[in-house]
Amino acid sequence: MPQQIELRNIALQAAQPLVHGVSLTLQRGRVLALVGGSGSGKSLTCAATLGILPAGVRQTAGEILADGKAVYPCALRGIKIATIMQNPRSAFNPLHTMHTHARETCLALGKPADDATLTAAIEAVGLENAARVLKLYPFEMSGGMLQRMMIAMAVLCESPFIIADEPTTDLDVVAQARILDLLESIMQKQAPGMLLVTHDMGVVARLADDVAVMSQGKIVEQGDVETLFNAPKHAVTRSLVSAHLALYGMELAS
Protein backbone atom coordinates (compact mmCIF):
# COMPACT_ATOMS: atom_id res chain seq x y z
CA MET A 1 0.00 0.00 0.00
CA PRO A 2 1.29 3.51 -0.80
CA GLN A 3 2.76 5.71 1.90
CA GLN A 4 2.16 8.95 0.02
CA ILE A 5 -0.37 10.31 -2.46
CA GLU A 6 0.43 13.49 -4.34
CA LEU A 7 -1.83 15.78 -6.32
CA ARG A 8 0.36 17.64 -8.77
CA ASN A 9 -0.82 20.78 -10.59
CA ILE A 10 -4.47 19.72 -10.81
CA ALA A 11 -6.59 22.03 -13.00
CA LEU A 12 -10.35 21.69 -13.44
CA GLN A 13 -12.69 23.48 -15.79
CA ALA A 14 -16.37 23.68 -16.69
CA ALA A 15 -17.62 26.67 -18.66
CA GLN A 16 -14.75 28.50 -16.99
CA PRO A 17 -11.66 27.49 -14.99
CA LEU A 18 -12.56 26.30 -11.49
CA VAL A 19 -9.36 24.90 -9.97
CA HIS A 20 -5.94 26.24 -10.90
CA GLY A 21 -2.77 24.16 -10.50
CA VAL A 22 -3.50 22.64 -7.10
CA SER A 23 -0.69 20.56 -5.57
CA LEU A 24 -1.12 18.67 -2.29
CA THR A 25 0.70 15.78 -0.61
CA LEU A 26 -0.96 13.26 1.70
CA GLN A 27 1.28 11.18 3.95
CA ARG A 28 0.46 8.15 6.09
CA GLY A 29 0.00 9.10 9.72
CA ARG A 30 -0.63 12.80 9.07
CA VAL A 31 -3.77 14.92 8.70
CA LEU A 32 -3.74 17.57 5.98
CA ALA A 33 -6.57 20.07 6.41
CA LEU A 34 -7.85 21.75 3.26
CA VAL A 35 -9.63 24.93 4.32
CA GLY A 36 -11.35 27.80 2.58
CA GLY A 37 -14.70 29.41 2.02
CA SER A 38 -17.65 27.94 0.14
CA GLY A 39 -16.97 27.70 -3.58
CA SER A 40 -13.20 27.84 -3.18
CA GLY A 41 -12.72 24.47 -4.90
CA LYS A 42 -12.14 22.17 -1.93
CA SER A 43 -14.76 19.55 -2.75
CA LEU A 44 -13.93 19.62 -6.46
CA THR A 45 -10.30 18.89 -5.59
CA CYS A 46 -11.45 15.87 -3.58
CA ALA A 47 -13.67 14.75 -6.45
CA ALA A 48 -10.72 14.92 -8.84
CA THR A 49 -8.66 12.79 -6.47
CA LEU A 50 -11.37 10.14 -6.48
CA GLY A 51 -12.26 10.41 -10.17
CA ILE A 52 -15.86 11.45 -9.47
CA LEU A 53 -16.04 14.92 -10.98
CA PRO A 54 -19.60 16.21 -11.50
CA ALA A 55 -21.09 16.31 -14.98
CA GLY A 56 -19.68 19.14 -17.06
CA VAL A 57 -16.44 19.44 -15.07
CA ARG A 58 -13.27 18.04 -16.59
CA GLN A 59 -9.64 17.83 -15.59
CA THR A 60 -7.49 19.82 -17.99
CA ALA A 61 -4.08 19.41 -16.39
CA GLY A 62 -2.17 17.67 -13.64
CA GLU A 63 -1.73 14.15 -12.34
CA ILE A 64 -2.06 12.03 -9.23
CA LEU A 65 0.86 9.98 -7.96
CA ALA A 66 1.11 7.17 -5.42
CA ASP A 67 4.63 6.85 -4.03
CA GLY A 68 5.86 8.84 -7.01
CA LYS A 69 4.11 6.79 -9.71
CA ALA A 70 1.26 8.21 -11.78
CA VAL A 71 -2.07 6.47 -11.12
CA TYR A 72 -5.66 6.75 -12.29
CA PRO A 73 -8.09 7.96 -9.60
CA CYS A 74 -10.27 4.88 -10.09
CA ALA A 75 -7.35 2.76 -8.88
CA LEU A 76 -7.37 4.66 -5.59
CA ARG A 77 -11.07 5.05 -4.86
CA GLY A 78 -12.32 2.72 -2.13
CA ILE A 79 -9.25 0.50 -2.17
CA LYS A 80 -6.54 2.97 -1.22
CA ILE A 81 -8.73 5.96 -0.33
CA ALA A 82 -11.85 5.65 1.81
CA THR A 83 -14.32 8.52 1.83
CA ILE A 84 -16.36 10.19 4.57
CA MET A 85 -18.78 12.43 2.72
CA GLN A 86 -20.28 15.78 3.64
CA ASN A 87 -23.90 14.63 3.46
CA PRO A 88 -24.10 11.03 4.67
CA ARG A 89 -27.81 10.74 3.90
CA SER A 90 -27.11 11.04 0.18
CA ALA A 91 -24.36 8.41 0.35
CA PHE A 92 -26.56 5.47 1.34
CA ASN A 93 -29.05 3.60 -0.83
CA PRO A 94 -32.45 4.18 0.85
CA LEU A 95 -33.61 0.70 -0.19
CA HIS A 96 -30.83 -1.17 1.63
CA THR A 97 -30.16 -1.79 5.31
CA MET A 98 -26.89 -0.90 6.99
CA HIS A 99 -26.02 -4.61 6.99
CA THR A 100 -26.29 -4.72 3.20
CA HIS A 101 -24.22 -1.55 2.80
CA ALA A 102 -21.47 -2.79 5.11
CA ARG A 103 -21.39 -6.32 3.71
CA GLU A 104 -21.28 -5.19 0.07
CA THR A 105 -18.46 -2.76 0.89
CA CYS A 106 -16.40 -5.56 2.41
CA LEU A 107 -17.10 -8.01 -0.40
CA ALA A 108 -16.22 -5.44 -3.07
CA LEU A 109 -12.82 -4.95 -1.44
CA GLY A 110 -12.19 -8.61 -0.69
CA LYS A 111 -12.44 -8.03 3.07
CA PRO A 112 -14.10 -10.31 5.64
CA ALA A 113 -17.86 -9.70 5.63
CA ASP A 114 -19.01 -11.90 8.51
CA ASP A 115 -21.37 -10.51 11.14
CA ALA A 116 -18.66 -10.42 13.80
CA THR A 117 -16.50 -8.14 11.63
CA LEU A 118 -19.42 -5.84 10.84
CA THR A 119 -20.48 -5.72 14.49
CA ALA A 120 -16.96 -4.84 15.61
CA ALA A 121 -16.86 -1.89 13.19
CA ILE A 122 -20.26 -0.64 14.38
CA GLU A 123 -19.18 -0.84 18.00
CA ALA A 124 -15.87 0.87 17.21
CA VAL A 125 -17.70 4.04 16.17
CA GLY A 126 -19.86 4.11 19.28
CA LEU A 127 -23.18 2.98 17.82
CA GLU A 128 -25.02 1.02 20.50
CA ASN A 129 -26.81 -2.27 19.83
CA ALA A 130 -24.97 -3.15 16.63
CA ALA A 131 -27.41 -5.93 15.74
CA ARG A 132 -30.25 -3.41 15.69
CA VAL A 133 -28.25 -0.78 13.79
CA LEU A 134 -27.40 -3.24 11.04
CA LYS A 135 -31.13 -3.80 10.45
CA LEU A 136 -31.89 -0.08 10.03
CA TYR A 137 -32.53 1.74 6.78
CA PRO A 138 -31.00 5.21 6.20
CA PHE A 139 -34.30 7.03 6.82
CA GLU A 140 -34.49 5.46 10.28
CA MET A 141 -31.19 7.02 11.38
CA SER A 142 -30.19 10.53 12.43
CA GLY A 143 -27.51 12.50 10.61
CA GLY A 144 -25.03 11.81 13.39
CA MET A 145 -25.73 8.07 13.27
CA LEU A 146 -25.31 8.01 9.49
CA GLN A 147 -22.02 9.90 9.74
CA ARG A 148 -20.74 7.40 12.30
CA MET A 149 -21.92 4.57 10.04
CA MET A 150 -19.94 6.10 7.19
CA ILE A 151 -16.87 6.18 9.43
CA ALA A 152 -17.51 2.52 10.28
CA MET A 153 -17.44 1.77 6.55
CA ALA A 154 -14.09 3.57 6.31
CA VAL A 155 -12.82 1.42 9.18
CA LEU A 156 -13.98 -1.72 7.34
CA CYS A 157 -12.14 -0.61 4.19
CA GLU A 158 -8.81 -0.47 6.07
CA SER A 159 -7.65 1.98 3.40
CA PRO A 160 -4.29 3.69 3.93
CA PHE A 161 -5.84 7.07 3.12
CA ILE A 162 -9.11 8.80 4.00
CA ILE A 163 -10.80 11.85 2.52
CA ALA A 164 -13.16 13.43 5.05
CA ASP A 165 -15.16 16.13 3.28
CA GLU A 166 -16.77 18.44 5.87
CA PRO A 167 -17.48 15.48 8.20
CA THR A 168 -19.09 17.62 10.95
CA THR A 169 -21.27 19.86 8.78
CA ASP A 170 -24.97 20.06 9.76
CA LEU A 171 -24.43 18.10 12.98
CA ASP A 172 -25.23 19.37 16.47
CA VAL A 173 -22.39 20.17 18.85
CA VAL A 174 -22.54 16.82 20.66
CA ALA A 175 -22.54 14.85 17.40
CA GLN A 176 -19.67 16.97 16.07
CA ALA A 177 -17.58 16.19 19.15
CA ARG A 178 -18.24 12.47 18.75
CA ILE A 179 -17.22 12.52 15.10
CA LEU A 180 -13.97 14.34 15.91
CA ASP A 181 -13.26 11.82 18.68
CA LEU A 182 -13.72 9.01 16.16
CA LEU A 183 -11.42 10.61 13.60
CA GLU A 184 -8.76 11.06 16.29
CA SER A 185 -9.16 7.41 17.28
CA ILE A 186 -8.74 6.25 13.67
CA MET A 187 -5.55 8.28 13.33
CA GLN A 188 -4.15 6.79 16.54
CA LYS A 189 -5.07 3.18 15.77
CA GLN A 190 -4.68 2.90 11.98
CA ALA A 191 -2.46 5.91 11.12
CA PRO A 192 -3.89 6.58 7.66
CA GLY A 193 -3.13 9.70 5.72
CA MET A 194 -6.15 11.97 5.95
CA LEU A 195 -7.32 14.86 3.79
CA LEU A 196 -9.70 16.76 6.05
CA VAL A 197 -11.84 19.29 4.20
CA THR A 198 -13.38 21.90 6.47
CA HIS A 199 -14.16 25.57 6.96
CA ASP A 200 -14.00 25.20 10.76
CA MET A 201 -10.64 26.33 12.09
CA GLY A 202 -11.47 24.75 15.45
CA VAL A 203 -11.52 21.36 13.73
CA VAL A 204 -8.22 22.24 12.05
CA ALA A 205 -6.61 23.17 15.36
CA ARG A 206 -7.72 19.91 16.94
CA LEU A 207 -6.94 17.38 14.22
CA ALA A 208 -4.56 18.73 11.58
CA ASP A 209 -0.81 18.39 11.29
CA ASP A 210 -0.59 20.45 8.11
CA VAL A 211 -2.90 22.99 6.47
CA ALA A 212 -3.52 24.13 2.91
CA VAL A 213 -5.66 27.24 2.42
CA MET A 214 -7.72 27.47 -0.77
CA SER A 215 -9.31 30.55 -2.33
CA GLN A 216 -10.84 31.01 -5.78
CA GLY A 217 -9.57 27.63 -6.94
CA LYS A 218 -5.96 28.16 -5.85
CA ILE A 219 -3.82 27.11 -2.90
CA VAL A 220 -2.81 30.45 -1.40
CA GLU A 221 -0.86 29.18 1.63
CA GLN A 222 0.45 25.88 3.00
CA GLY A 223 2.33 24.97 6.15
CA ASP A 224 2.28 23.10 9.43
CA VAL A 225 -0.67 23.91 11.67
CA GLU A 226 1.34 25.69 14.37
CA THR A 227 3.03 28.06 11.93
CA LEU A 228 -0.20 28.81 10.11
CA PHE A 229 -2.06 29.72 13.30
CA ASN A 230 0.79 31.75 14.77
CA ALA A 231 2.04 33.53 11.65
CA PRO A 232 -0.47 33.39 8.77
CA LYS A 233 0.74 35.29 5.72
CA HIS A 234 -2.03 35.43 3.13
CA ALA A 235 -5.02 37.71 3.70
CA VAL A 236 -7.46 34.80 3.39
CA THR A 237 -5.57 32.78 5.99
CA ARG A 238 -5.36 35.74 8.34
CA SER A 239 -9.10 36.26 8.01
CA LEU A 240 -9.84 32.61 8.83
CA VAL A 241 -7.51 32.56 11.84
CA SER A 242 -8.75 35.93 13.11
CA ALA A 243 -12.37 34.77 12.97
CA HIS A 244 -11.45 31.64 14.91
CA LEU A 245 -9.54 33.55 17.59
CA ALA A 246 -12.37 36.06 17.96
CA LEU A 247 -14.59 33.25 19.25
CA TYR A 248 -12.30 33.10 22.29
CA GLY A 249 -11.90 36.85 22.72
CA MET A 250 -8.42 36.78 21.22
CA GLU A 251 -6.79 38.71 18.42
CA LEU A 252 -4.20 37.78 15.83
CA ALA A 253 -0.86 39.40 16.46
CA SER A 254 0.04 42.02 13.86
Curated annotation (Swiss-Prot):
Q: Which InterPro entries match?
A: AAA+_ATPase (IPR003593), ABC_Ni/Peptide_Import (IPR050388), ABC_transporter-like_ATP-bd (IPR003439), ABC_transporter-like_CS (IPR017871), Nickel_NikD (IPR014138), P-loop_NTPase (IPR027417)
SUPFAM superfamilies (alphabetical):
P-loop containing nucleoside triphosphate hydrolases
Q: How does it sit in the membrane?
A: Peripheral membrane protein
Enzyme nomenclature, EC number: 7.2.2.11
Q: Residue ranges of the ABC transporter domain?
A: 2-241
SMART domains, alphabetically?
AAA (SM00382)
Statement: the UniProt record of this protein carries the keyword ATP-binding: yes
Q: Which GO terms describe its cellular component?
A: plasma membrane
Positions of ATP binding: G36, G37, S38, G39, S40, G41, K42, S43
Q: What Pfam families would the database entry show?
A: ABC_tran
What Gene Ontology molecular-function terms does this entry list?
ABC-type nickel transporter activity; ATP binding; ATP hydrolysis activity; nickel cation binding
Q: Which reaction does it catalyse?
A: Ni(2+)(out) + ATP + H2O = Ni(2+)(in) + ADP + phosphate + H(+)
- CDD domains the record matches: ABC_NikE_OppD_transporters
The cross-references to PANTHER family, in alphabetical order and at most eight, read: DIPEPTIDE TRANSPORT ATP-BINDING PROTEIN DPPD (PTHR43297:SF2), OLIGOPEPTIDE TRANSPORT ATP-BINDING PROTEIN APPD (PTHR43297)
Q: Subunit comment for this entry?
A: The complex is composed of two ATP-binding proteins (NikD and NikE), two transmembrane proteins (NikB and NikC) and a solute-binding protein (NikA).
Family (UniProt): Belongs to the ABC transporter superfamily. Nickel importer (TC 3.A.1.5.3) family.
**Function according to Swiss-Prot or TrEMBL:** Part of the ABC transporter complex NikABCDE involved in nickel import. Responsible for energy coupling to the transport system.
- The molecule here is called Nickel import ATP-binding protein NikD
From what organism does this protein derive? Shigella sonnei (strain Ss046)
